[in-house]
């Protein structure tokens, strides 16, 4: 069983650094392509302010020169979902679970173990960057598929932006999750609920070393409970009742 989570724009470089690992050929190609961009080019590419573009330019040059500092991906990313994942004071068993089951889908590094070393960067699949005349999604599709080809159980906590990178035969195997709040008999779903709940759900999986779909259906965490009547074979729905 593998669990797939996306990257995040928010980063925390106040965490402990770790030694870098050798980069894949695709990652090197992307870095080489980005290294040709000026600060002004990057501001346009990412639709960001000049000062942010300058920061990104410096990051890219460090990646190109192999002087970039690297951090465990799970700790470097610090978006809302990540802030709701249990990341501190993991037991040996919990850390082993993370190493065995959790994968992060990156537009720069590919599908990587959650604790793999990565450098700070801004790139995502919405970036209109061409590498060898291919979009980032096209560039990575085959590699993404190979990364999880042998997995029978594939849990996706990804947005469509990341799921679409995988080949159809892999997407068809994915178990997806919907997290909803119910208030006064009405159920709703929105981005903030989903991002927080994904992190809380992942924490539950880590703490309880969950590896079976039957155990996921018994899950209860942070007020969310599995709803058999709302779920489908490959879409599991969890609902949290909140006071009116």
Swiss-Prot record:
It holds the Pfam family H2O2_YaaD. GO terms for cellular component: cytosol. One of its GO terms (biological process) is response to hydroperoxide. InterPro entries: YaaA. PANTHER family: PEROXIDE STRESS RESISTANCE PROTEIN YAAA (PTHR30283:SF4), PEROXIDE STRESS RESPONSE PROTEIN YAAA (PTHR30283). Belongs to the UPF0246 family. This is UPF0246 protein SGO_1307.
